[in-house]
UniProtKB/Swiss-Prot annotation:
Keywords from the named record: Cell cycle, Cell division, Cytoplasm
Residue stretches in coiled coil: none
Protein name according to UniProt: Ataxin-10 homolog
Domain of life: Eukaryota
Keyword Secreted recorded: no
Record gene name: CTR86
Subcellular location: Cytoplasm
Leader sequence residues: none
One GO CC term on file: cytosol
Species classification: Eukaryota, Fungi, Dikarya, Ascomycota, Saccharomycotina
GO BP terms, alphabetized: cell division
Keyword check for Isomerase: no
Length: 489
């Protein structure tokens, strides 16, 4: 069939369907005939990009489809049962065709689709056999269109159409054919920064829905299903937006809700390996702000003789989450630059000192004794994570090396070059950190040598770092061991 003849047959069918749907002048036989013709067009449009491009070459077809969308399910809906069913089926066919075509070319606005969906909801009972089938197509239509356009200022319309309709949301939640494209639609819409800004500043309904769905999903499973993956992609966009920090401040940091959100934040932050600098800066804003808050609270509780164990547990949970996020993002140079700019090393050393002095080291020898001590504070894993963060800040930075010595952080890290069951791997992390602190820094090396001379540094710990103390001309000096020299060759 020639291209012109092909288009002509499609436009003739579309106009005929328009007449049936909008003018209510046809009989049952006309409806059936149009259904058959429309079905063939829908089938062809789902299989061939070339076919879709050909029938979209003339603006006439999109205009007809948009007119049908804008005027259907209003006053022209037939009341006779058979005709009503055929009306819905014809409309579903038009939606299927529009769904297929919109991935090739945008010819309709989101508002037209959402408005048509609302009219459909008002006119068609949920018990109708074609209700769910048609609703699926509406949502697929929205999902397809959202792939090629990031239309702005539609958050309020989405909330009005979907989230204020509890019955509709219940149907979506219990039907994978709806739930999947709906999640894809929201993910695509929230890829637009302006829409995200709307969600985070004006109406956070979509954000809270995403959090609720993530709570139900098994996002810790390595083999994520497609729905969970879509939710994670959506939340990645959210937490990496510059306004998320302000939204998070609206949540009481002492609430269970805050802790629940922070757990999700941790999973999402640590699940991605290719954050860009803009995203990193946005995330570090809320991570570091909250780290400062929980660091101060932690120090206050640990230094107090009277405290609430439940509060300590809650604060500890949130602090671990924030330190884990900083540790994971430490692989990015932008993170290092951010933390250096905000002088994070001072707070890290301050917190490390308080935890080190307030919480007893746990070993095989004293484990039972510590556990039996009533009211003994436990704050596991914190020191290990702090030292890991310090290590990546120190690495290759003479300025941070100097600050660590001046702020007496160097001896703190040295004091942790030993096994502590409260902090798995702290010995290994501390040894790496000390290596970075001593690398090409004579003042730090001399400082450690002087400490060793006063017998305040463990010889074995120094050897593991790759250094040993020697006396030269009556002066105590730190030198690399032969093994360390060989490793560097």
């Amino acid at each position: 069939m020639m291209e012109e003849e092909l288009y002509k047959s499609v436009i003739v069918t579309a106009k005929s369907v328009r007449s049936v749907l909008l003018e209510e002048t046809s009989n049952v036989e006309d409806c059936q005939k149009n259904l058959n013709a429309l079905g063939q067009i829908v089938s062809a449009s789902s299989q061939s990009q070339e076919y879709r491009s050909q029938i979209l070459a003339n603006n006439g077809l999109p205009d007809v489809l948009v007119e049908i969308l804008n005027r259907s399910f209003q006053d022209n809906v037939p009341t006779e049962e058979l005709k009503f069913t055929l009306y819905i089926r014809l409309m579903r066919g038009i939606l299927l065709l529009a769904r297929n075509l919109v991935i090739t070319k945008q010819f309709v606005e989101f508002s037209s689709i959402l408005s048509s969906l609302e009219n459909f909801n008002q006119k068609v009972s949920h018990n109708n056999e074609f209700y769910s089938k048609t609703l699926v197509v509406y949502i697929q239509f929205l999902a397809n269109m959202s792939q090629i356009t990031r239309e702005q200022n539609i958050v309020a319309e989405i909330v009005e159409t979907f989230f204020k309709n509890e019955d509709l949301m219940s149907l979506i939640a219990n039907d994978d054919q709806m739930k999947m494209p709906f999640a894809a639609f929201l993910k695509n819409i929230l890829s637009n920064s302006d829409n995200l800004y709307d969600v985070l500043t004006h109406d956070d309904t979509i954000l809270r829905y995403t959090i609720s769905e993530l709570d139900k999903a098994d996002i810790h499973n390595e083999d994520l299903d497609q729905y969970s993956s879509l939710l994670i992609l959506t939340f990645q966009n959210i937490i990496a937006h510059e306004t998320y920090s302000k939204w998070l401040k609206r949540i009481d940091c002492e609430s269970a809700e805050f802790s629940r959100i922070m757990k999700l934040n941790q999973v999402i932050v640590t699940s991605k390996e290719d954050w860009d600098n803009y995203q990193l800066t946005a995330m570090l804003a809320w991570i570091f702000d909250n780290f400062l808050v929980f660091s101060e609270i932690s120090k206050s509780i640990l230094l107090s003789s009277i405290y609430d164990p439940l509060e300590l547990k809650r604060v500890h949970l949130n602090l671990i989450i924030l330190l884990d996020c900083l540790s994971d993002l430490g692989k990015f140079e932008a993170t290092k630059q951010f933390l250096e700019h905000y002088n994070a090393i001072e707070e890290l050393i301050s917190l490390l000192r308080v935890v080190h002095e307030s919480v007893d080291r746990k070993t095989l020898k004293n484990k039972e004794k510590i556990e039996e001590t009533v009211g003994k504070k436990e704050f596991p894993q914190v020191k290990s994570l702090i030292i890991e963060v310090i290590a990546f800040l120190v690495h290759g930075s003479f300025e941070i090396q100097e600050k660590m010595r001046e702020l007496h952080g160097l001896e703190l890290v040295l004091s942790n070059c030993m096994i502590d069951d409260n902090d798995p791997f702290i010995k290994e992390r501390a040894i790496v950190c000390v290596k970075f602190l001593l690398a090409n820094n004579e003042k730090n090396q001399q400082f450690v040598a002087d400490l060793e001379a006063k017998q305040t540094v463990d010889d074995d710990a120094l050897k593991e770092v790759g250094y040993e103390v020697q006396i030269e001309d009556g002066n105590v000096k730190l030198r690399k061991t032969e093994n360390q020299k060989l490793q560097e060759i």
